[in-house]
Each structure stands twice: as C-alpha cells, then as structure tokens.
Amino acid sequence: MPRKGPVPPREIPPDPKYGDVLVQKLINKVMKDGKKSVAEWIVYTALEEAAKEVNMHPVELLHKVIEKLKPEWEVRPTRVGGATYQVPIEVPERRQISLAIKWLVQAARERPRGREQYTMIERLKAELLDALNERGGAYKKKEETHRMAHANMVFSHFRW
C-alpha cells in the first residue's frame, strides 16, 4: 500500500441560496438516492417555516440548533488486557458538527407520522424547533452521549 499520509478533508461548497456550508451539509444528509433538488426543497422550506415561528434568520437558526446539539464528549471502546472499556474522549470540532447534523436528520426521520407531522418538512421543522428549546430526539441523543461519557470518566486514564 502506498504511504502518502492522511487524506485532506474534502471541501464542501456552500449552498446556492444562503451561501452557507452548514446548510449544504444538512442538505447532503437529508438527500436520498441522489435527489438533491428534493433535499434542498425539504431543507429550505423547513428552515424558513421554523425561522418564521421564532422570528430568526434561517441560517442563524440552524447555527444555533447545531451549536446546541454538538457533543463535547463521547465514549470509544478500548481493549486493555482482555477487557473492553468505554473510554470517554473529547470530540473534534468536525465530528461534533457531523454528529449534530446526523442526529438531527435521524431524529426527524424517526418522528411518528401523525396528523400534524406527515411530511419530512414538517418533521424536520418540528425537530429544529425542539432542538432549539433543548427537547426532541436529537437533543436526547446528545444528552445520552454525555451521560455515558460522564459515567465512564473513571476509565479516562486509558486515553492514549
């Protein structure tokens, strides 16, 4: 195998409407089967409707939501002498953003399809507003991750 070192992170171009990289990352995560125009429509509509409810700019809303969902700690399994320990580690900034977006979209997709929240637009909008108010599936996932890391702090000396 050639040894050319680590691969540099890929540059993601900003989205066409707001010129923001974070919005583009959300669009890419919502996209299914390469249907980017559908994903753009879902994300833009959900952001605009959610922003209208809280009187904010859509990009500002997304940045606040992602900031609230970013995990600072997570656990990684580490094998030491035949036993596997869940060792808490600090999460790098890039991974924090990736996890926050992943949890947001995952929680929106898993929301029950009721009368008020039938389409993905409505579910994503509801999840954005819930995350802004520190509720919802994505926020619970972050809290659960932090709880796991805090509970396993006794193994933090295995970080190397």
Curated annotation (Swiss-Prot):
InterPro entries: Ribosomal_uS7, Ribosomal_uS7_bac/org-type, Ribosomal_uS7_CS, Ribosomal_uS7_dom, Ribosomal_uS7_dom_sf. Keywords: Ribonucleoprotein, Ribosomal protein, RNA-binding, rRNA-binding, tRNA-binding. PROSITE patterns: RIBOSOMAL_S7. One of its GO terms (molecular function) is structural constituent of ribosome. Pfam families: Ribosomal_S7. One of its GO terms (cellular component) is cytosolic small ribosomal subunit. GO terms for biological process: ribosomal small subunit assembly; translation. One of the primary rRNA binding proteins, it binds directly to 16S rRNA where it nucleates assembly of the head domain of the 30S subunit. Is located at the subunit interface close to the decoding center, probably blocks exit of the E-site tRNA. NCBIfam families: rpsG_bact. Part of the 30S ribosomal subunit. Contacts proteins S9 and S11. Belongs to the universal ribosomal protein uS7 family. This is Small ribosomal subunit protein uS7A. It comes from Aquifex aeolicus (strain VF5). The lineage of its organism: Bacteria, Pseudomonadati, Aquificota, Aquificia, Aquificales.
